[in-house]
Amino acid sequence: MMKRDKKEEIAQQIAEKFQKSQGFYFTEFQGLDVQKMGQLRLEFRKAGIEYKVVKNTLIKKALRDAAGADKLAEGLKNTTAVAFSYDDPIAPAKIIKKFSKDNEALKFKMASVDGTVFGADALPQLSEMLSKTDNIARTAGLINNMIASVPMVMNAVMRDLVSVIDQVGKLEK
């Protein structure tokens, strides 16, 4: 059994992870064998996501000062592992959805993404969202297209103006 001061220390470390992360996801893994759990951890590690098995009581202590703590605490039943994402808050949703298709033992409980709490039914929507990198790339592409189209529009205006002047000149003759 863990001593109280050790539990407080672990709860403090978990609280720091919650604060640093842009998104965190609670999963249930009961029934997932060691090999599958290793594969899941590897997938998370490749994406720069930290995946930890944590006791529910320690998670509750770590969340006591967090926004939405009551709502998050409701989902803490059975075994819980937490995926902490520090860069891309949507990446864990994509991994969880993909991995749980072949491994029904992995269940999504809930998540907090940029301070918004999502329930167990939100995984499909979360996994379909674009990452920040994708959004930035899409926005940059739109801006680039707008910049590229400005000279074409200006040329069209000038061409039309020349055409109108030419037509007026022909009418006066």
Swiss-Prot record:
Pfam families the UniProt entry points to: Ribosomal_L10
Record's keyword terms, sorted: Ribonucleoprotein, Ribosomal protein, RNA-binding, rRNA-binding
The UniProt record lists the keyword Ribonucleoprotein: yes
GO molecular function: large ribosomal subunit rRNA binding; structural constituent of ribosome
InterPro entries hit by this protein: Ribosomal_uL10, Ribosomal_uL10-like_sf, Ribosomal_uL10_bac, Ribosomal_uL10_bac_type, Ribosomal_uL10_CS_bac
Annotated GO biological process: translation
Family the UniProt entry places it in: Belongs to the universal ribosomal protein uL10 family.
Described function: Forms part of the ribosomal stalk, playing a central role in the interaction of the ribosome with GTP-bound translation factors.
Protein name per Swiss-Prot or TrEMBL: Large ribosomal subunit protein uL10
